[in-house]
UniProtKB/Swiss-Prot annotation:
NAD(P)H-hydrate epimerase, as annotated region: 1-220
Family the UniProt entry places it in: In the N-terminal section; belongs to the NnrE/AIBP family.
CDD domains: YXKO-related
Required cofactor names: K(+)
EC number: 4.2.1.136, 5.1.99.6
Protein name per UniProt: Bifunctional NAD(P)H-hydrate repair enzyme Nnr
Region (NADPHX 1): 58-62, 131-137
Length: 512
């Protein structure tokens, strides 16, 4: 099933709703901490010292509840607290722990060597420093404890709600941060845990209840949906007896230039392996006889080009008059180059085509230079990697890498549908935001993005212009990389192999 995640402010509002229902905040904290302690005990059965790092807020209060329940089970527990002035439910949790004979050390009164010795002798550490309670850079005693933890401790680590050092909504690094083996999150997963870099620091995620039914206090619509291979069975492409090529839909690929002839054919291969009924590959006329035999299953359409071998705006007239009313999805940009002819063609298509359009590769660079025409009528999906996204947003690749949710939201607000490629690719249109938890570094090879653009085109042609179709395509592409890696192809793969493997994944959906 998909992972439905919520922004921290929505979960805080859910807590308030539970209180309005008559469940006191202290009871919610007790339920959450007790459930987390059960998960921790069942998973680790700690026989040595357990060190629980408690921050100043409610996450620290959760930590005190966990400490008490682990102590009740017989664990040797020491709490290292950054606060000497707790209030409210957090203070009550500390008082109950102390009343049971619990041991608390104020971090400000313990030297670095003493903290290091305490952590170095632990068999388990629980991070209850901040959870989702920080939006700024980690500092003070919290930063000090995290730095000492990273220097001196290498054993299992459990985070409560979110690993310290990462934003609960965006997953952005807040400076120094912990890497958990297990994150016990309360009521529902937090959105930030779905995005890198936080995703790579969460470890296994377990959701613990707080004593109220989630459906009564959380919004009906999640802020972020995480999808992966297990969800493919719910996204199957339509197929029935008597289905023909027309039912499967036509994908038209428009690309190629004097320098890059193979890219559009890789997109055509992706579309075919992604299940399209027909694929038309429109390329500069000089490339048609050279590359056409590489993908004989596609129909190659020679198109007008200039003296450099780049497509011109007249290419749209040819493809529109030949196939316009039959095209269900258009893929534009692979290998197109960035010359004046290509730029004119992109502007022409954006202004003329009123169906689904997947804009990729050089088409994105042209879009960054010229902007989206005011008269654009197409249903646009852009598929940038982080460098192309940076060009479209007028920022740096580093910013995009470090702020993937913010980048995807900015792109979607400007251009419509977006697939921000990379670790945990982000799919977004309107307010619907999905994160695809599938993929492998072996996918970072030339032509991989061209193949993905074709698979997206095929999924849209089969399922319609819906976010689910795009998510399915991105999952297929990601799982193809994972399957190749598991078969010994963790490096040195070819883009065409990704397409072929995606077809095998697609064909095996009945086994999901």
């Amino acid at each position: 099933m998909p992972i439905v995640a919520y922004d921290p402010d929505k979960v805080r509002e859910a807590d308030r709703a539970a209180v309005r229902m008559g469940v006191p905040g202290g009871i919610l904290m007790e339920n959450a901490g007790a459930a987390a302690a059960s998960v921790i005990w069942d998973r680790f059965r700690p026989t040595g010292r357990v060190v629980i790092l408690c921050g100043p807020g409610n996450n620290g209060g959760d930590g005190f509840v966990v400490a008490r329940h682990l102590m009740i089970r017989g664990a040797e527990v020491v709490v290292l607290s950054t606060s000497v002035d707790r209030r409210g439910d957090s203070k009550a949790a500390e008082d109950m722990y102390l009343a049971c004979g619990g041991r608390v050390l104020a971090s400000s009164e313990v030297s670095d060597p003493e903290v290091s010795d305490l952590l170095g002798g632990a068999c388990l550490v629980v991070d209850a420093l901040l959870g989702t309670g920080s939006g700024g850079e980690i500092r003070g005693q919290v930063a000090r404890l995290v730095e000492l933890l990273l220097e001196t401790y290498s054993g299992p680590l459990v985070a409560l709600d979110m690993p310290t050092g990462f934003h609960g909504r965006t997953g952005v690094s807040l400076g120094v941060g912990v890497r958990a083996d297990l994150t016990v999150t309360f009521l529902a997963p937090k959105s930030g845990a779905m995005f890198t870099p936080a995703f790579d620091h969460v470890g296994e995620m377990v959701v613990s209840p707080i004593g109220v039914p989630p459906r009564l206090v959380l919004p009906q619509r999640a802020d972020v949906v995480g999808v992966g291979y297990e969800d493919l069975s719910h996204m199957r492409l339509p197929m029935w007896p008597g289905q023909n090529k027309s039912h499967r839909g036509m994908v038209a690929v428009l690309g190629g230039s004097g320098m890059f002839g193979g890219a559009p054919f890789l997109s055509a291969m992706g579309a075919l392996c992604g299940g399209a009924g027909w694929v038309v590959c429109g390329v500069p006329s000089q490339w048609a006889p050279t590359y056409g035999h590489l993908v004989p299953e596609s129909m190659v359409l020679p198109l007008p080009s200039d003296g450099r071998g780049d497509l011109t705006s007249e290419a749209w007239d040819v493809i529109a008059s030949s196939y316009g009313d039959r095209i269900r999805c258009l893929v534009l940009g692979p290998g197109m180059g960035r010359g004046e002819g290509a730029s004119s063609l992109v502007r022409r298509v954006l202004s003329s085509w009123d169906g689904p359009l997947v804009l990729d590769a050089d088409g994105l660079r042209i879009l960054a230079d010229t902007g989206l025409p005011r008269e654009a009528r197409c249903s646009l999906w852009i598929t940038p990697h982080e460098g192309e996204a940076a060009c479209l947003l007028g920022t740096s690749s580093r910013w995009v890498v470090e702020n993937r949710r913010d980048a995807a939201e900015a792109l979607a607000s400007r251009f419509g549908g977006v697939v921000l490629k990379g670790r945990n690719s982000v799919v977004m249109r309107g307010e619907a935001l999905s994160v695809v938890c599938a993929g492998h570094p072996n996918l970072s090879v030339p032509g991989s993005g061209d193949v993905l653009a074709g698979i997206i085109g095929a999924s849209i042609a089969r399922m319609g212009d819906v976010e689910e179709a795009v998510c399915l395509a991105v999952i297929l592409h990601g799982v193809a990389g994972e399957r190749l890696a598991s078969s010994g192809r963790a490096d040195g793969i070819l883009a065409r192999e990704i397409a072929h493997q995606a077809a095998l994944v697609l064909g095996g959906l009945g086994d999901v």
